[in-house]
């Protein structure tokens, strides 16, 4: 993946690939395997999915506000804090993956009608130090870039479970 800024098409491709890739990787595993950590200090596949859902919630809501409002002010929320307000870690993997995939389909549908200039829409983000100006492109790119190594993490976990 390029180290610079991703194009809109690259972002959309990466976002579309995540949920089906996770589904393919985890096909055939039983719930106990998906909830088992390969090592004591590591996440299970379910923990990784819960984290991805939390990030999608937080950054997806920022994206929605940026699209809906002109130059809004958004209070930063850490996905690690947000996950504590959910039951994502306790959910069964397959229904959780289905919810994640549905959320992703909905997000991609929101992006579909956007003009290229809409990706430059901004928000001022507060609550994490000095206020920062972030774009729709920034949030979408964070989501896409952040997800990729976690999908690889799920692949490593699954390979361990299948040994």
Task: Show which residues each predicted segment covers.
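Active-site rim elements
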Residues: 7-11, 92-97, 139-140
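Solvent-exposed, charged/polar functional surfaces in cytosolic regulatory/catalytic domains
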Residues: 21-28, 106-113, 149
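Amphipathic, well-ordered alpha-helical segments in soluble domains
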Residues: 18-21, 25, 55, 103, ...
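Acidic/histidine-rich alpha-helical segments that form the ligand environment
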Residues: 14-18, 83-120
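Aromatic-acidic/polar surface patches that form glycan- and anion
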Residues: 11, 15, 41, 100, ...
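Short, contiguous alpha-helical
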Residues: 35-81, 108, 119-163
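Extreme N-terminal tail/first-helix region
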Residues: 1-20
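A glycine-rich, hydrophobic loop/mini-helix early in the fold
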Residues: 28-29, 39
């Amino acid at each position: 993946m390029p180290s610079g800024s991703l194009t809109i098409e690259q972002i959309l491709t990466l976002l579309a690939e995540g949920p089906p890739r996770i589904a393919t990787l985890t096909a055939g595993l039983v719930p106990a395997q998906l909830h088992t950590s390969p090592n004591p200090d590591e996440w299970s596949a379910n923990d990784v999915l819960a984290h991805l859902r939390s990030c999608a919630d937080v950054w997806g809501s920022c994206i929605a506000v940026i699209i809906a409002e002109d130059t809004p002010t958004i209070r930063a929320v850490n996905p690690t804090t947000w996950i504590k307000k959910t039951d994502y870690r306790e959910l069964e993997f397959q229904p959780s993956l289905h919810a994640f995939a549905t959320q992703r389909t909905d997000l991609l549908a929101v992006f579909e009608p956007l003009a290229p200039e809409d990706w430059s829409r901004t928000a001022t983000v507060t609550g994490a130090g000095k206020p920062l100006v972030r774009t729709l492109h920034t949030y979408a790119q964070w989501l896409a870039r952040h997800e990729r190594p976690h999908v690889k993490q799920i692949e490593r976990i699954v390979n361990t479970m299948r040994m």
